[in-house]
């Protein structure tokens, strides 16, 4: 599964991580590819290494959504 992160913080608080095919992903100019991972939690480890405030999308990554 390919993951992307929103380079703009959502609500000024979180950089949301999404599956590439998520209907709620940001527009292409605000996407940064994180890479391909087998599990959401592994993608979040990488996302948090880039953006400490990274959070999972409540729609495509509900187990990683905490904000």
Residue ranges and their predicted role:
Residues 32-67:
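Short, mixed-charge low-complexity intrinsically disordered segments
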Residues 4-31, 62-67:
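Short aromatic-glycine-(Arg/Gly/Cys) micro-motifs in beta-strand/loop hairpins
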